């Protein structure tokens, strides 16, 4: 693996060849960092850790702290799945990321991963599901297809009266403790010599196409050779002109139902994760907090990640109760024990934005996780570190994640065009 000395030497070489001295190649004056990463969520947290592990001097900054309750990475749990319809890149990324999470779990020495079946309930093979089945065949990812009768035998706690079949992911799916794992990532980052600060950061001074400092809300400035903005749902607030028409930030709610006493049918590992292509929504078996279900929202409600109240919406609570009673008859009268309101930061085509800032050669943008970015954290960390350190990456992936490749969109709640 490239260490800091050889990286600086190589970068200087590359820079000399390119006739410019990239930021990190310049020995950082005094207390300057090689890299400052703004945002300690699933994207920024992993980017900072991987860069630190590669020997760089890294500062991780978050205005509210890692996995803070406003952040999209702060949910108790998130799902890891390889089922992505026709989007093969995310199927293979998810399969790789799952392997990385398993290694990290061993390193962290605590249980954060809960492997389970993931069932997609359907009545017809949509083009997206047909494409997914082919991708699973091509990537040799194991799966099963069970009809209604077989589903009733395998998962008797669920009602399949309106379901013809299910596509079942076997070894490529898991539930991950999201909030907990992001706190561990930040702890391990600091244990490995990374610096962490709670502060709101904005772009600071610049010389030509080189941003030299970040300005912090306490009036101080920090210098860094390179800067990564991994601000998730705050990216459009940070760069309104650049990101304002590229990402949409809207609410997403889910709730936890209390399982019956002494009854483990609705809990991991007996209860699989599921995605309902018929009624809508998805959920996981209980891991500590209850049976989780997120009803389909039937439309987007814009959300300001700083100021929005995280209180559940009545009509979605009703949709959730009706659904649980339908899909889990023995849970019809179960109490809702907890509710969560989070925000999704999605691009028009649901692809990530990982690219340099158009005005600065040493500034990186890493966001656009949408409703699916958490699982990819470890791989996003490696990928961005490779890009930032000038290591070869897949040009097709680079192109896919380019900011300019994202279609413009009309953000939810924004005034009519
Ligand atoms: C309800 C819901 C369910 C989801 N389910 C899944 C799932 O099952 N599987 C999956 O893989 N993904 C899922 N996702 C998506 C996933 O959670 C996100 O894609 C991912 O967490 C995004 O991480 P992030 O680091 O980009 O953003 P965040 O986690 O929001 O992190 C951004 C951080 O930047 C900080 N920040 C912002 N601006 C500044 C600033 N100026 N200065 C300092 N700090 C700043 C914030 O405090 C925040 O901590 C879900 C998302 C939601 C909302």
Describe each model-derived feature in a short phrase.
Residues 1-15:
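N-terminal secretory signal peptides and thylakoid transit peptides that target proteins
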Residues 2, 99, 125-192, 197-198, ...:
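Flavin (FAD/FMN) cofactor-binding and adjacent substrate-gating region
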Residues 33, 217-226:
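Core beta-strand elements of the Rossmann-like FAD/NAD(P) dinucleotide-binding domain
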Residues 35-59:
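N-terminal Rossmann-like FAD-binding beta1-loop-alpha1 element of flavoenzymes
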Residues 49-53, 109-114, 233-361:
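Active-site substrate-recognition segment that forms the wall
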Residues 53-72:
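Glycine-rich FAD pyrophosphate-binding loop
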Residues 77-154, 280-281:
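Dinucleotide-binding Rossmann-like beta1-alpha1 core, especially the glycine-rich loop
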Residues 330-417:
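C-terminal catalytic lobe of FAD-dependent flavoproteins
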């Amino acid at each position: 693996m490239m260490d800091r000395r050889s990286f600086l030497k190589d970068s200087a070489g590359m820079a000399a060849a390119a006739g410019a001295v990239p930021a990190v190649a310049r020995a950082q004056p005094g207390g300057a960092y090689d890299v400052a990463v703004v945002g300690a969520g699933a994207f920024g947290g992993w980017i900072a850790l991987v860069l630190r592990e590669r020997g760089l001097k890294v500062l991780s900054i978050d205005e509210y702290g890692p996995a803070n309750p406003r952040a999209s990475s702060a949910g108790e749990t998130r799902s890891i799945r390889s089922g992505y319809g026709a989007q093969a890149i995310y199927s293979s990324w998810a399969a790789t990321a799952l392997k990385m999470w398993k290694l990290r779990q061993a390193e962290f020495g605590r249980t954060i991963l809960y492997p389970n079946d993931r069932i997609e309930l359907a009545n017809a093979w949509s083009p997206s599901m047909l494409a997914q089945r082919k991708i699973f065949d091509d990537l040799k990812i194991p799966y099963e297809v069970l009809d209604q009768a077989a589903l009733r035998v395998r998962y008797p706690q669920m009602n399949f009266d309106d379901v013809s079949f299910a596509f079942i992911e076997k070894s490529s799916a898991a539930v991950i403790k999201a909030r907990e794992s992001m706190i561990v990532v930040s702890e391990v980052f600091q244990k490995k010599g990374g610096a962490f600060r709670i502060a709101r950061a904005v772009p600071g001074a610049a010389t030509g196409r080189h941003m030299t400092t970040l300005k912090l809300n306490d009036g101080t400035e920090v210098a860094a050779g390179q800067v990564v903005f991994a601000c998730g749902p705050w990216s459009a607030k940070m760069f309104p002109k650049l990101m304002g028409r590229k990402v949409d930030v809207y609410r997403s709610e889910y709730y936890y139902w209390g399982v019956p006493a002494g009854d483990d049918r609705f809990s991991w590992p007996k209860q699989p994760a599921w995605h309902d292509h018929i009624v809508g929504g998805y959920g996981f078996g209980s891991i500590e907090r209850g049976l989780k279900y997120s009803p389909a929202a039937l439309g987007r409600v814009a959300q300001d990640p700083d100021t929005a109240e995280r209180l559940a919406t009545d009509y979605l609570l009703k949709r959730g109760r009706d659904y649980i009673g339908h899909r889990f008859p023995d849970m019809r009268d179960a109490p809702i024990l907890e509710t969560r309101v989070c925000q999704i930061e999605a691009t028009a085509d649901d692809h990530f934005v990982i690219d340099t800032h158009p005005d600065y050669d040493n500034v990186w943008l890493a966001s656009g996780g949408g409703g699916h970015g958490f699982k990819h954290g470890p791989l996003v960390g490696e990928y961005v570190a490779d890009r930032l350190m000038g290591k070869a990456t897949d040009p097709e992936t680079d192109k896919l994640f380019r900011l300019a490749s994202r279609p413009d969109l009309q953000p939810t709640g924004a005034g009519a065009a």
